[in-house]
Amino acid sequence: MTVLIIGMGNIGKKLVELGNFEKIYAYDRISKDIPGVVRLGEFQVPSDVSTVVECASPEAVKEYSLQILKSPVNYIIISTSAFADEVFRERFFSELKNSPARVFFPSGAIGGLDVLSSIKDFVETVRIETIKPPKSLGLDLKGKTVVFEGSVEEASKLFPRNINVASTIGLIVGFEKVKVTIVADPAMDHNIHIVRISSAIGNYEFKIENIPSPENPKTSMLTVYSILRALRNLESKIVFG
């Protein structure tokens, strides 16, 4: 597999380290050269690339996606908070209808998306509570505090780098059905996501406590491995979930 990785932060570097690729291209505006990686000076999708992996930012998703959709590639997107922008979301999916590309949204920092996608037509509401250390939200607080309650769209304006989980859920069931609570807790040294699903099929609750990456406490290693799983599934004859 020949890949183009957008973003050479902690996630991108881990993919290079742990992935099994024939050739790796990378596009990153600030990263230094990495051994074994062909760094692109300007953004493009080389003709030999079969898969594009975005692990940079919601801004990168908005800036490069429409160009990527012109190529016959598998496009894996992790910064799904870009889709909280309704204007961009509508344009993206409009372009995708006639695109030769296929788009994949990994589960990222949570689980249970197989359940959610299976019953999406019957879902009434999804409530997601995210508990984070205040510093990861750019806050300095002394006690546990609810810092936000509301819609995914509203949350994305205040915490654009912390809404990927909620945005992925919104892409599955519809953003209007998702309610977000963000809690800052100084006692926490990791992130917790609690997802509560109410549906005509059943009610479900998932609690995910992620251990931060040693290199970047803001990143969950589960996110890295969910991307690696998505990459493996592209070539595997057996797929679970």
UniProtKB/Swiss-Prot annotation:
Instruction: Name the reaction it catalyses.
Output: L-aspartate + NADP(+) + H2O = oxaloacetate + NH4(+) + NADPH + H(+); L-aspartate + NAD(+) + H2O = oxaloacetate + NH4(+) + NADH + H(+)
A GO molecular function held by the record: NADP binding
Cite the active-site annotation. H193
Summarize where NAD(+) binds, as residue positions: A109, N164
UniProt keyword annotations, A-Z: NAD, NADP, Oxidoreductase, Pyridine nucleotide biosynthesis
Additional notes on this entry = The iminoaspartate product is unstable in aqueous solution and can decompose to oxaloacetate and ammonia.
The record's listing under NCBIfam families reads: NAD_NadX, PRK13303.1-4
In which family does this protein belong, per the annotation?
Belongs to the L-aspartate dehydrogenase family.
Q: What is this protein called?
A: L-aspartate dehydrogenase
Report the gene name: nadX
